Amino acid sequence: QKGNNFWYEYKTSNGKAWYVVDPVAKTKRSLFDLDDIAAQITEIVKDPFTAQQLPIQKLEAGEDGRTFTFQITSSQEVKKDSTDKDKGPKKEIFFFSYDYPTRKLTWLQDKKKETEYPDWASFSPDGKKLLFIAQVKTVKSTADKHPDLPKATGIIVTDLMYKHWDEWVTTAPHPFVADFDGNGISNIVDILEGEPYESPMKPWGGIEQLAWNTTSDKVAYTCRKKTGLEYAISTNSDIYIYDLNTKKTENITEENKGYDTNPQYSPDGKYIAWQSMERDGYEADLNRLFIMNLETGEKRFVSKAFESNVDAFVWGADAKVIYFTGVWHGESQIYALDLTNDSVKAITSGMYDYEGVALFGDKLIAKRHSMSMGDEIYSVALDGSTTQLTQENKQIYDQLEMGKVEGRWMKTTDGKQMLTWVIYPPQFDPNKKYPTLLFCEGGPQSPVSQFWSYRWNFQIMAANDYIIVAPNRRGLPGFGVEWNEQISGDYGGQCMKDYFTAIDEMAKEPYVDKDRLGCVGASFGGFSVYWLAGHHDKRFKAFIAHDGIFNMEMQYLETEEKWFANWDMGGAYWEKQNPVAQRTFANSPHLFVEKWDTPILCIHGEKDYRILANQAMAAFDAAVMRGVPAELLIYPDENHWVLKPQNGVLWQRTFFEWLDKWVKKAPSK
């Protein structure tokens, strides 16, 4: 949201569209004349783009509400570095600014200094400068070391973090500041000149990890100033403030040893806020909100009253309140944090998740979704009343009947209460018996909230005549710190008992066919599936594991973010005197393969460097060698997620073919 309007992107199978909305006048206009801008881009990029195939990415609005920046990836190939192991050619990227009222497009290039592959951008409040991100080479290629071997493809590795998420690491994103005169950029300065560090931090950090101050002469940025092994075992990032005039940098969070991320200056310029985790190496630590008085340096932990993570946040116009989203009891709501007394009050309620929040006069703008509806944009008044501003998928929803979603509180084996979501088929008949699926969440510290997924979509499962049981088992945020932290070092413990509680309680219902139960999950949920396959005592008729851990010892060494393995597994498997680590590795699913007796489908992406695909291959091989019916779906070009549309369709078809064969069509006693 900028100025008096907000903009949004709308994706369909036919391409993308971009709209500008005035919520007061209740008008919606296309941001681009698609035919015109396609012609302009084609002329500059020398690629024949059409209005339906505009590869516009990373669109950002300027403070004036009329100027936008974005990037275009052309089909033109550029020379690849020999350390670049991504399959396929490398494409040239172009960076543009666009004036919305005049429809003028400008190719942003500094004629004095070339900066390769500019990325996310942010205009300064005075509109005279541009902050953007560009990749800087940090790893010498084989060709650099051996120029006489230009065709050599081998990579020489000398330290950790050589892979991250889904890429071989050869560059680091750096923040750059440039003068902007409306026609182009000049006087580019690399804030991290000569430093091998990342800002924003990979793999998902974007422009939200950097911020302009109100006077346009300072930039706050997030950075973990570590490389190699030190990077791999630490989450200790900090907030730095760079002065454009003096070129000096100040670390304002040096005393904190965990994550410090996402700075935001207050509208009056007197304070800066950021998100902070306390402990080094613990990526699922409580995400707290801090503010600092820029004059006195006084820092304050202001979100103590909210015993869950502070997610997206935005300052109120008077700098006396901060609005934020956070998960509590399986829902992500918008809250108001009163900075006069640090009290927290919920603004929204209901079975929804609000995601992202922006201030818009005396209202807030946010995305909202649920298990029954994908993202739409809402206006939220401070009294909690809401107005839906977009109806992009109404014509589809009007043709569908969604299944009922309800929350049930269940007593766990240790006497606590656990929220479990139950999703019923459309036209549910309590007099019938339904095949039922236990859903195992990933993370492991990710909430089973009112999320909407194109892959793990509960309404699609329900429409295929399954009941879905989705427990908020131990190790999820939104139920207090103790509940969230219990899972670390106890992967085969209470969380697994919680799974059994959820499915056993539901199996008591007359409409749940206890002879036709399935179990599915991804990531930690995939680990859960592999573990349950050796412990379920014939509860389930079939399993599906996506990107799951099968062998914990191999996972400890294979995963790239070692801080996660150290914290959640409790240490290395060779630490024989470490009882927590030894308990973790004693619960590795591969140790219980002799008990596998139930059909299992294993799914994995070969570009998944968080959990390598050989985990699924090993699980599949073990099942086949045990004589257990098994199937393996491997994606050579997908990471920890399935992102390509037709791969997603293949996933759904394979998923339901397996369940229908082994669960739905299983004999019912």
Go through each PLM region and give its residues.
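Active-site-proximal cap/loop segments of hydrolase catalytic domains
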Residues: 457, 462-463, 470-669
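Glycine-rich His-Gly loop
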Residues: 135, 224, 369, 439-443, ...
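Beta-propeller folds
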Residues: 1-345, 362-363, 371-373, 379-383, ...
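The serine-hydrolase catalytic nucleophile loop
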Residues: 433, 444-458, 473, 614-615
